[in-house]
């Protein structure tokens, strides 16, 4: 039995957002010790890079794993929730979850999964907070 080839594809986009690393479960002193300058009461921002990787069989009719134009639109729906926002104040998820880049990766994965026409091909998302700080989430 012939099996269709498995291919990964990746789309990259970016967004700018502000946040403050602060946990309500920690005292002010513990927050300062844990998060350092990222606990600044006025917050700070990043120009994030968001990479989305899909993995699946190549459709014999379209020759694609997933329609890139469709993925671009779906990613745009997610980007609209975070781009030029204060994550802690403007995104419901982060009102109760510390806005670490680990949690940003989880949020972006789950949010994208919820709007994709075929979420089964979503393999992983990567958030680059800086060129040296990179976080990847593959889902549960």
Swiss-Prot record:
Pathway: Cofactor biosynthesis; tetrahydrobiopterin biosynthesis; tetrahydrobiopterin from 7,8-dihydroneopterin triphosphate: step 1/3. Keywords: Lyase, Metal-binding, Tetrahydrobiopterin biosynthesis, Zinc. One of its GO terms (biological process) is tetrahydrobiopterin biosynthetic process. The active site is at residues 38, 84, 129. Zn(2+) binds at residues 19, 44, 46. Its EC number is 4.2.3.12. This is Putative 6-pyruvoyl tetrahydrobiopterin synthase. It comes from Caenorhabditis elegans. The lineage of its organism: Eukaryota, Metazoa, Ecdysozoa, Nematoda, Chromadorea.
